[in-house]
């Protein structure tokens, strides 16, 4: 299987082409040695991960099935999970208060496990707009939002949003009134942030499911606001 890259106006698209014909047979227990792909050389850390994983399995400290299940759980983490939590807080003031006071407990009761790290929920209001960044790397509440977007990890965003947040927000189409304070929060290795956006006007008659459908990932990072299209 070869990964082919092609340039487009939106960046690089990855397509797969299978030009490796398997004309030879494999024994059931046969293992291929790790080989570098054309576009993805095996780095030191990838080799170390593979070696440690194989050693743990060999020593019966963990099974391949347990690793697979954990990867599936990680892959299931998507922004829609966070959107459901936000929508619930808009519909239920008691849950909202719990979410702000003790996010881990509230989210666990809602049905998601956010792990051992500290999570702080930042509520946007008419007077304060919160936006999240990780200036050092890409720390991000992956348990409820999935993987961070590429722009969140970029050096440009990480360096500019702390210096000129309003300008950066404008580039996302978000114009914050000068009467509203913009606060930038820097995530760390042991602490993450989740923005609780303001509920959009005109959504009073909407159901919790309908509200959740309005909430995008970027609003929970703080670079956009939630609106009714």
Can you name each region flagged by the protein language model?
Residues 5, 15-229:
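Terminal, compositionally biased segments used for targeting/anchoring and flexible tails
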């Amino acid at each position: 299987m070869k990964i082919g890259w092609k340039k487009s106006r939106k960046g690089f698209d990855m397509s797969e082409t299978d030009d490796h014909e398997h004309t030879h047979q494999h024994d059931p227990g046969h293992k291929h040695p790790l080989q570098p792909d054309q576009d993805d050389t095996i780095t030191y850390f990838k080799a170390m991960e593979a070696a440690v994983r194989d050693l743990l399995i060999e020593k019966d400290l963990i099974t391949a099935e347990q690793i697979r299940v954990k990867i599936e759980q990680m892959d299931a983490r998507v922004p829609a999970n966070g959107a459901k939590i936000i929508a619930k807080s808009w519909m239920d003031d008691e849950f909202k208060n719990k979410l702000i006071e003790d996010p881990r407990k509230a989210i666990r009761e809602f049905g998601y496990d956010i792990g051992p790290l500290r999570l702080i929920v930042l509520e946007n209001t008419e007077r304060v707009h919160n936006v999240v960044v990780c200036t050092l790397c890409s720390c991000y509440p992956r348990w409820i939002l999935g993987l961070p977007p590429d722009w969140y990890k970029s050096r440009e965003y990480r360096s500019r949003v702390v210096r000129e947040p309003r300008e950066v927000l404008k580039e996302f189409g978000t114009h914050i009134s000068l009467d509203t304070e913009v606060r930038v929060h820097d995530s760390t290795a042991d602490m993450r942030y989740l923005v609780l956006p303001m509920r959009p006007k005109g959504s009073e008659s909407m159901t919790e499911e309908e509200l959740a459908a309005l909430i995008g990932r970027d609003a929970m990072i703080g670079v956009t606001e939630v609106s009714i299209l």
